[in-house]
Amino acid sequence: MNLIFTRIIRRFGEGKRKTPFPGDPILVPDEPYDSKIQESQLSPMPQIDAKLINHLERLSLVRFDSEQAVANLRSSIRVAKRLELVDVEGVEPMHTVWEDQECPTFEDVEEDPLPIEEVFRNASLRFDDFFVTPPGNLPLESKERFDLNVINEWDTIGKPVAPEVKLTRMTERKK
């Protein structure tokens, strides 16, 4: 393991920062930026309930398995709400994060379609002329796993971490 790590350091350099093009200035700060936006200017935080958590789990395929995970979601929403205050009047949308870098697009070229049997050759399951995919993120528990009142008050309390996790079958197995 140390040999691999040593080779990686020799190849890429220890502590060297990478940029897309040599000579580009590094625009990412070393320390996090402390926002000057007043919390009173932000729109109110949405109340997170069990229905919303289940909906987000289904959409994102991410399992909120602890109160800390839901508290992190609230923290992310709070950061995203700051973007509502950004004035973007007259600013053209960017296609890439690098202003001076081209984002080439190609013309659509019509090609001969593949035969259906060749398309489905690698499909493990097939129904008529459709691929059968595995089901998405299905909720495992229908009961509420979290104390939602505490979570919805968590960021107003000002604590750096969420309250203690309630014991469930999932957390008991992890211990």
Swiss-Prot record:
Main location: mitochondrion
GO CC aspect terms: glutamyl-tRNA(Gln) amidotransferase complex; mitochondrion
EC primary class: ligase
Matching Pfam families: GatC
Keywords assigned by UniProt, alphabetized: ATP-binding, Ligase, Mitochondrion, Nucleotide-binding, Protein biosynthesis
Subcellular location(s) per record: Mitochondrion
Biological process (GO), any one: regulation of translational fidelity
Catalytic activity, as annotated: L-glutamyl-tRNA(Gln) + L-glutamine + ATP + H2O = L-glutaminyl-tRNA(Gln) + L-glutamate + ADP + phosphate + H(+)
GO molecular function terms noted in the UniProt entry: ATP binding; glutaminyl-tRNA synthase (glutamine-hydrolyzing) activity
Record keyword Ribosomal protein present: no
SUPFAM superfamilies: Glu-tRNAGln amidotransferase C subunit (SSF141000)
Enzyme nomenclature, EC number: 6.3.5.-
Subunit relationships: Subunit of the heterotrimeric GatCAB amidotransferase (AdT) complex, composed of A, B and C subunits.
Similarity comment: family membership: Belongs to the GatC family.
Miscellaneous notes: This protein may be expected to contain an N-terminal transit peptide but none has been predicted.
Function field: Allows the formation of correctly charged Gln-tRNA(Gln) through the transamidation of misacylated Glu-tRNA(Gln) in the mitochondria. The reaction takes place in the presence of glutamine and ATP through an activated gamma-phospho-Glu-tRNA(Gln).
Record's protein name: Glutamyl-tRNA(Gln) amidotransferase subunit C, mitochondrial
Species per Swiss-Prot/TrEMBL record: Caenorhabditis elegans
Classification of source organism: Eukaryota, Metazoa, Ecdysozoa, Nematoda, Chromadorea
